[in-house]
């Protein structure tokens, strides 16, 4: 930490105070954002933090002038938080920032126009990020992480401030997205429901009115929720919206969306092009797509095993596992086509024995009972049209379209 | 002022205990005294209440109940009535008393509770107490009167004990004056304690002598005690003049004079009673007719009350010695033996007094009695009707009369009942449970005086009638308070000696020369005996109170000054005691309505306290209760200072919260204290008294220290219970108070218990019960090791076996934390269970994902985990063939969890088949594929056919269409079935989720 003289420290602090008060009085949101954006680690903020560590009695400076003391509470907490943040005491920094955020939100509530919306966004973002960092600290110290949860309730409060009729309401979706991030991180996604309900049903909100970036984020998260619920058509709609509307230059974001959209599309019977997977570095799906194309059950299982951890964490494992039935369908289709070539007259009769043999080639050792079971499931789920003659151990396929394509419809349950 | 006065007065009265308590805080003193008394005082309270009741009865019951006592009580009531003006205060004090009573009750529980109630009622008499008391009182009175009439004479003999009661009455008075019932209570406590709750009084006043007295008291006091209660009432009446209280206190030592004085003021002038009155009353008690006289004069009545108290206290003390310890039960028991009748009567009196009290009281005793009698009758009936609420109070009364006892909870005074109902019910149960001990007591009670004798004889706790008569005579000879004091001391010694010689019941007390009272006058000896009895009583009571008291402590009692302060205090007590919302509510009510409501709350709290004690008794038995009492007394002391503030804050939710936390803290502390007390013998009352006192002192110190500390600063490790119970089998009962080390099994015993359960051939319900109790003991002792894991694992497996998923879930969540703490166990086995459970029963994708992602590669190699994962795969894909194959090869208890999914899987499978297969499927195939042959089947023909039958049955109940082909084979007509298949409503669905658990088993278990 570079040495800072007392005078220099005094100067820096006073400058910050001046800029803050100017920003507020001129309603200069962008300046205010810069002044509050801790995580940007901007040089002015870092030097101010150093100055604060030298010049301990910053509160006297705030009190010095009426101009500063009007926002004395806000500024004092900002300083304390920045100070702690600079020295790496993230928990303290979070606590001070939380107080600041509360004071700021209170102040924001009193401002009639929504000029400070951007600054509020910064505050919401910073509090969430700080809380995550503080929780990491707490966990490494063996304490229970609880700051993110606290940040969640603060964000909820902010949401309440914005959910009104005035011009501030367009900020509600940003806060909602921050809440989603918080809840997904905490694993309490069920808490999202109440926010979603108010966004989607409250008349004060017109979804199209919100900023695009927030809409994309919102759709991404709600799409993920639908994946959890295995509601694939809805997930498809939401994630597709996110994909179509997100900034095409943000490849990371596109990849995040595709990570969920690809499995969703797969379970709807829509197979992506290899380039897509390549372009967005989604190689974990490559094998799965191949397995689906080939009807290679073994490949599917290998692919699932290979990336099990990743799929489990992202929550698509179960979705991908269910592709198994489509793989079976593909396999049956191949057997059927094969049989058609050799014996067109009896092509629509698939012997269970033959299926078992095919599976054995794939290293899937199944007896007839199990094969029959799988065939009944395929028929039941309408992946295969026809019936199973138990007595003769034959699957009799329908003459018309024995293997109907899903074409965007989910596998019936 | 009043408080101060009271305290001071008290101090003189009971130099040791009282002074200590009182000495601590002028204002707080009362509280302290309460607290102390709670432990020991509580008994006093009970005693007081009893007295009050007795007094009320006195008018009525005096003749009936303990004639002497009744008169006293009657006067008390009468006095109280006069005092009405001061009622607000008195009412408050009454509440306080009630609260104390409650705590005290714990030991004597039922009886004391009632007494307390009645006491409260008495105190209320001043203000509104009478009303409340009247409710309960009337009932008691009725009963008491009946019994009382016969008993009174005998009880009169016990005057000594009565003397003790006077002190109670003094307390009452104090409350009335003070409103700081506390001060009064304290005094009362001392006296009462001496009389009924040996602990307080004894500790301070005449510990040694008390013991002796106790014995004596027990014999005599019981009967007398009821009168004491009456006295208390009178004392409450006395409340008017604080000065009187002081006098009372002093007199307390000389119970009579003091009591009388208070009574006189309280009651009205009744009898300027003080000493002379008391002395008079004492003798009077002996004769019912006298009682009336005393009634006319409060003082006499007071004296009587004292006696009753002593009696009550004695019985309690004696009974406490017995395992009966359970608060209610014990109380009942105690009362039942000696005072039973009396105590109960007092409550009745109180109740009655509220109803009719004033008139009755005011009127000559006889007249009152008449009036009361009717009331009593009513009250009794009412008691019967609303046993729950009033029962506690009534119970005391019931104790007096066996009938009453049986009805015990009869006291259904609407007000009380409402508050007490739950408690009463419990009480009822308890009483029934206690039946063995209680029943006798009750019987004796029912047999008014004669019964008392018998009871005394049968029950060690009770003193023989002849002894009572002897004591009465001795007291009758006393010319002044001093004489009475000395007489009491002497009597105590005599009784103690007799007890030690085991001649208590064999000696011919009727012919015993009064000169034996030696040194001081007979009266003195009597008074001393009264004190002793009161002390004995108090000690048990105190403990219960203390438990509650901790809560009370939480509340600041700074505000006692207001007229309602006493009520407030009472309310506070209630709050503290109860920690319950009811108490706070009652407080609020009290504030609004002043006396009456507070009393109720007090009653409620008392009831609650009773209930809790009862439970405890069940758990630990007498010894445990005794310990509890001590602890409670300590807590009470601490609490007293807070009362005033508590009163003020009681209403607020915040305060409630704080109270709760405090109460919890106290519970822990109490538990700790109990731990200290463990060494104390449960049954040895005398020995216990000393030890109890010592513990109480220790505890009080602890409390004082802890009081200033934040809950967070408490070293919980130091407070962790260390069990001493050596019983391997123990039934599970949900703890409602701090655990008692005497009922907690140490680790090595728990280990044996676990093995016992594992080897047991009994059914799941038994094992579940045993395991729950083991778990409880482990939790209470904060044991977190492999044994804990083993217990939970065992229980989880058994629960799985029995299909008890809720219990299984409890165990699993505990096991998760245990494994997370690094405790070794079968973590993989349970990881598998957990996986299966989520897959098969919770069907939560996110949960499944997260639990799957927690498994390491290593974990997945475990057979059970691998199996569980395969099952999951089979279920998600609907592969029924795989599922039932896995079912047959399931390791551990995996199949038990799968069992619960079999039905769904079969339904799914048949649904699949009937939709996909044409035209038919042989049933034999279904049998084979869907595991109808049973997991363990080896494929023998017999089992095959069994499976066939099962399968057909299953198919039929699910709407399948079965046809028979030419070969006689059964076939499933798939086309017809596909549309007719349905999932039947489970016929044998039971709320607990397992039809294997017979409902009747549950009922028999509870």
UniProtKB/Swiss-Prot annotation, chain A:
Q: Which InterPro entries match?
A: Csn12-like, PCI_dom, WH-like_DNA-bd_sf
Tissue distribution is: Expressed at low levels in roots, leaves, stems and shoots. Detected in seedlings, roots, leaves and anthers.
The molecular function terms of the Gene Ontology recorded here are: double-stranded DNA binding; RNA binding
Domain annotation PCI: ranges: 216-402
Would I find Phosphoprotein among this entry's keywords? no
Q: What happens when the gene is disrupted?
A: No visible phenotype, when grown in absence of ethylene. Extreme ethylene responsivness, when treated with saturating ethylene concentrations. Curly leaf.
Going by the entry's taxonomy, the superkingdom of the source organism is recorded as: Eukaryota
Keyword Nucleus applies: yes
A cellular-component GO term for this protein: nucleus
What compartments host this protein? Nucleus
Q: Which GO terms describe its biological process?
A: ethylene-activated signaling pathway; poly(A)+ mRNA export from nucleus; response to ethylene; root development
| Keyword vocabulary terms for this entry | Nucleus
Database matches in Pfam families: PCI
Question: Subunit composition?
Answer: Interacts with EIN2 (via C-terminus). May also interact weakly with CSN8. Interacts with DSS1(V), AMPD, SAC3A, SAC3B and At5g61290 (AC Q9FLK4). Interacts with UCH1 and UCH2. Interacts with NUP1, anchoring the TREX-2 complex on the nuclear pore complex.
Query: What PANTHER family does the record tag this protein with?
Result: PCI DOMAIN-CONTAINING PROTEIN 2, UNCHARACTERIZED PROTEASOME COMPONENT REGION PCI-CONTAINING
What is known about what this protein does? Involved in the regulation of ethylene response. Probable TREX-2 component required for nuclear RNA export. The TREX-2 complex (transcription and export complex 2) functions in docking export-competent ribonucleoprotein particles (mRNPs) to the nuclear entrance of the nuclear pore complex (nuclear basket). TREX-2 participates in mRNA export and accurate chromatin positioning in the nucleus by tethering genes to the nuclear periphery.
What name does UniProt use for this protein? Enhanced ethylene response protein 5
Task: Name its species.
Answer: Arabidopsis thaliana (Mouse-ear cress)
Classification lineage: Eukaryota, Viridiplantae, Streptophyta, Embryophyta, Tracheophyta
From Swiss-Prot, chain B:
Q: Show the segment(s) annotated as Disordered.
A: 1-75, 106-162, 183-239, 266-326, 516-550, 595-638, 650-690
The record's subcellular locations are: Nucleus
Q: Where is the composition biased (Basic residues)?
A: 609-618
Pfam short name (any one): SAC3_GANP
Instruction: Supply the alphabetized keyword list.
Output: Nucleus
PROSITE patterns reported in the protein's UniProt record:
PCI
Start and end residues of each PCI domain: 804-978
Annotated Gene Ontology cellular components are: nucleus
Q: Which InterPro entries match?
A: PCI_dom, SAC3/GANP/THP3, SAC3/GANP/THP3_conserved
The annotated regions of Low complexity compositional bias extend over 116-140, 516-539
Keyword Nucleus assigned to the entry: answer is yes
| Matching SUPFAM superfamilies | Metalloproteases ('zincins'), catalytic domain
Phenotype seen when the gene is deleted: No visible phenotype. Sac3a, sac3b and sac3c triple mutants show no visible phenotype.
**Regions of compositional bias (Polar residues) in chain numbering:** 26-75, 106-115, 144-162, 269-282, 313-326
Here the segments flagged for biased composition (Basic and acidic residues) are 653-680
What's the domain of life for this entry?
A: Eukaryota
GO annotation terms (biological process): alternative mRNA splicing, via spliceosome; RNA splicing
How does this chain assemble?
Interacts with EER5, SAC3B and CML20.
Family, per the entry? Belongs to the SAC3 family.
State the function annotated in the UniProt record.
Answer: Component of the TREX-2 complex (transcription and export complex 2), a muliprotein complex that functions in docking export-competent ribonucleoprotein particles (mRNPs) to the nuclear entrance of the nuclear pore complex (nuclear basket). TREX-2 participates in mRNA export and accurate chromatin positioning in the nucleus by tethering genes to the nuclear periphery.
Q: What is this protein called?
A: SAC3 family protein A
């Amino acid at each position: 930490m570079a040495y800072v003289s007392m005078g220099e420290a005094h100067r820096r602090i006073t400058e910050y105070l001046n800029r803050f008060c100017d920003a507020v009085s001129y309603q200069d949101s962008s300046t205010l954002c810069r002044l509050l954006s801790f995580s940007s680690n901007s040089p002015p903020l870092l030097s101010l933090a150093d100055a604060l560590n030298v010049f301990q009695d910053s509160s006297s400076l705030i009190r010095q002038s009426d101009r500063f003391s009007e926002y004395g509470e806000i500024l004092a907490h900002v300083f304390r938080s920045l100070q702690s943040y600079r020295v790496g005491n993230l928990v303290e920094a979070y606590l001070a920032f939380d107080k600041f955020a509360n004071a700021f939100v209170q102040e924001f509530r009193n401002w009639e126009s929504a000029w400070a919306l951007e600054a509020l966004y910064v505050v919401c973002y910073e509090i969430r990020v700080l809380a995550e960092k503080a929780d990491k600290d707490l966990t490494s110290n063996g304490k229970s992480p609880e700051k993110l949860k606290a940040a969640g309730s603060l964000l909820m409060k902010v949401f309440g401030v914005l959910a009104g009729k005035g011009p501030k309401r367009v900020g509600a979706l940003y806060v909602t997205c921050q809440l989603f991030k918080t809840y997904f991180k905490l694993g309490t996604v069920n808490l999202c429901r109440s926010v979603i309900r108010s966004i989607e049903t409250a008349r004060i909100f017109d979804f199209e009115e919100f900023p695009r970036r927030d809409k994309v984020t919102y759709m991404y998260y709600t799409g993920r929720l639908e994946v959890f619920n295995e509601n694939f058509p809805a997930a498809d709609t939401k994630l597709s919206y996110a994909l179509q509307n997100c900034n095409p230059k943000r490849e990371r974001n596109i990849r995040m969306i595709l990570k969920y959209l690809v499995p969703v599309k797969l379970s709807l019977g829509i197979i992506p092009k290899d380039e897509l997977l390549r372009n967005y570095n989604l190689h974990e799906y490559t094998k799965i797509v191949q397995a689906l194309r080939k009807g290679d059950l073994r490949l599917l299982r290998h692919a699932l095993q290979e990336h099990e951890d990743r799929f489990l964490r992202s929550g698509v494992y179960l979705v991908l596992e269910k592709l198994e039935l489509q793989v079976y369908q593909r396999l049956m289709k191949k057997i059927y086509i094969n049989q058609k070539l050799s014996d067109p007259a009896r092509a629509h009769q698939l012997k269970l024995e033959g299926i078992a043999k095919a599976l054995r080639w794939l290293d899937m050792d199944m007896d007839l009972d199990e094969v029959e079971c799988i065939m009944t499931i395929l028929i039941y789920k309408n992946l295969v049209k026809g019936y199973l003659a138990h007595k003769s151990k034959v699957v009799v396929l329908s003459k018309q379209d024995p293997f109907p394509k899903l074409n965007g419809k989910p596998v019936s349950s | 002022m009043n408080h101060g006065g009271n305290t001071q007065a008290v101090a003189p009265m009971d130099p040791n205990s009282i002074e200590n308590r009182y000495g601590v805080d002028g204002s707080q003193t009362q509280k302290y005294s309460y607290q102390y008394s709670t432990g020991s005082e509580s008994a006093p309270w009970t005693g007081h209440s009893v007295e009050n009741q007795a007094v009320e009865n006195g008018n009525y019951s005096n003749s009936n109940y303990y004639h002497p006592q009744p008169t006293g009580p009657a006067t008390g009531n009468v006095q109280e009535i006069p005092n009405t003006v001061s009622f607000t205060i008195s009412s408050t004090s009454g509440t306080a008393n009630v609260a104390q009573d409650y705590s005290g009750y714990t030991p004597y529980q039922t009886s004391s509770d009632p007494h307390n109630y009645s006491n409260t009622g008495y105190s209320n008499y001043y203000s509104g107490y009478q009303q409340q008391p009247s409710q309960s009182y009337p009932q008691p009175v009725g009963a008491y009167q009946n019994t009382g009439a016969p008993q009174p004479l005998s009880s009169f003999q016990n005057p000594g004990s009565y003397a003790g009661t006077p002190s109670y009455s003094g307390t009452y008075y104090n409350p009335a004056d003070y409103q700081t019932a506390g001060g009064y209570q304290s005094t009362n406590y001392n006296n009462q304690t001496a009389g009924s709750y040996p602990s307080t009084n004894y500790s301070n006043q005449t510990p040694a002598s008390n013991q002796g007295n106790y014995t004596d008291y027990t014999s005599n006091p019981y009967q007398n005690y009821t009168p004491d209660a009456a006295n208390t009432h009178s004392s409450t009446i006395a409340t008017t003049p604080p000065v009187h209280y002081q006098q009372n206190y002093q007199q307390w030592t000389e119970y009579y004079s003091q009591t009388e004085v208070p009574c006189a003021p309280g009651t009205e002038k009744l009898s300027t009673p003080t000493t002379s009155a008391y002395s008079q009353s004492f003798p009077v008690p002996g004769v019912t007719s006298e009682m009336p006289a005393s009634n006319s004069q409060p003082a006499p009545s007071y004296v009587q009350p004292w006696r009753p108290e002593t009696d009550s206290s004695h019985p309690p003390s004696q009974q406490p010695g017995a395992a009966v310890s359970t608060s209610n039960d014990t109380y009942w028991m105690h009362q039942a033996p000696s005072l039973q009748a009396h105590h109960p009567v007092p409550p009745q009196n109180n109740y009655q007094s509220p109803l009719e009290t004033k008139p009755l009281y005011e009127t000559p005793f006889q007249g009152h009695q008449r009036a009361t009698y009717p009331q009593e009758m009513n009250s009794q009936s009412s008691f019967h009707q609303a046993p729950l609420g009033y029962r506690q109070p009534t119970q005391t009364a019931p104790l007096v009369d066996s009938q009453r006892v049986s009805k015990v909870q009869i006291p259904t005074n609407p007000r009380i009942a409402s508050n007490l109902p739950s408690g009463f019910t419990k009480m009822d149960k308890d009483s029934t449970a206690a039946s063995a001990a209680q029943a006798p007591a009750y019987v004796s009670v029912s047999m008014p005086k004669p019964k008392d004798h018998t009871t005394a004889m049968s029950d060690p706790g009770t003193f023989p009638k002849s002894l009572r008569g002897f004591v009465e005579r001795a007291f009758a000879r006393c010319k002044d308070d001093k004489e009475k004091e000395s007489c009491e001391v002497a009597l105590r010694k005599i009784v103690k000696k007799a007890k030690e010689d085991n001649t208590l019941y064999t000696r011919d007390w009727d012919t015993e020369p009064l000169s034996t009272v030696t040194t001081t006058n007979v009266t003195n000896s009597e008074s001393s005996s009264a004190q002793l009895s009161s002390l004995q009583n108090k000690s048990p009571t105190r403990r219960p109170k203390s438990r509650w008291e901790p809560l009370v402590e939480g509340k600041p009692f700074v505000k006692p000054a207001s007229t309602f302060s006493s009520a407030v205090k009472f309310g506070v007590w209630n709050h503290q005691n109860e920690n319950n919302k009811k108490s706070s509510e009652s407080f609020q009510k009290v504030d609004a309505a002043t006396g009456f409501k507070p009393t109720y709350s007090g009653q409620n709290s008392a009831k609650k306290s009773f209930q809790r004690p009862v439970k405890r008794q069940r758990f630990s038995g007498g010894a445990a209760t005794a310990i509890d009492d001590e602890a409670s007394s300590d807590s009470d002391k601490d609490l007293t200072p807070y009362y005033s503030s508590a009163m003020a804050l009681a209403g607020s939710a915040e305060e409630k919260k704080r109270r709760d936390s405090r109460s919890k803290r106290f519970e822990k502390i109490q538990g700790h204290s109990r731990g200290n007390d463990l060494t104390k013998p449960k049954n040895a009352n005398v020995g216990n008294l000393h030890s109890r006192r010592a513990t109480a002192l220790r505890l009080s110190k602890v409390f004082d220290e802890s009081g200033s500390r934040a809950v967070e600063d408490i070293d919980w490790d130091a407070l962790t219970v260390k069990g001493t119970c050596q019983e391997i089998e123990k039934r599970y009962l949900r703890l409602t108070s701090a655990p008692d080390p005497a009922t907690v099994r140490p680790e090595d015993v728990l280990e044996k218990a676990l093995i016992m359960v594992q080897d047991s051939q009994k059914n799941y319900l038994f094992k579940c019960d045993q395991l729950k109790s083991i778990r409880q003991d482990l939790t209470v002792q904060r044991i977190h090791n492999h044994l804990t894991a083993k217990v939970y694992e065992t229980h989880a497996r058994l629960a799985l076996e029995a299909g008890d998923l809720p219990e299984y879930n409890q165990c699993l969540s505990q096991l998760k934390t245990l494994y997370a703490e690094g405790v070794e166990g079968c973590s993989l086995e349970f990881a598998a269970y957990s996986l299966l459970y989520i897959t098969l029963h919770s069907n939560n994708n996110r949960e499944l994902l997260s639990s799957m992602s927690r498994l390491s590669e290593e974990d997945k190699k475990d057979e059970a985990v691998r199996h569980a994962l395969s099952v999951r795969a089979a279920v998600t894909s609907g592969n029924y063939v795989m599922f039932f194959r896995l079912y047959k090869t399931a390791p551990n208890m995996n199949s038990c969890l799968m069992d619960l999914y079999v039905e769904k899987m079969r339904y799914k499978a048949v649904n699949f088949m009937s939709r996909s297969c044409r035209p038919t499927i042989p049933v034999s195939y279904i049998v084979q594929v869907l595991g109808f042959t049973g997991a363990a089947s080896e494929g023998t023909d017999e089992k095959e056919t069994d499976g066939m039958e099962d399968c057909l049955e299953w198919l039929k109940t699910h709407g399948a269409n079965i046809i028979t082909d030419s070969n006689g084979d059964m076939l499933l007509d798939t086309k017809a079935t596909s549309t007719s298949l349905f999932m039947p409503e489970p016929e044998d669905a039971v709320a607990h989720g397992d039809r294997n658990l017979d409902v009747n088993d549950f009922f028999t278990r509870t």
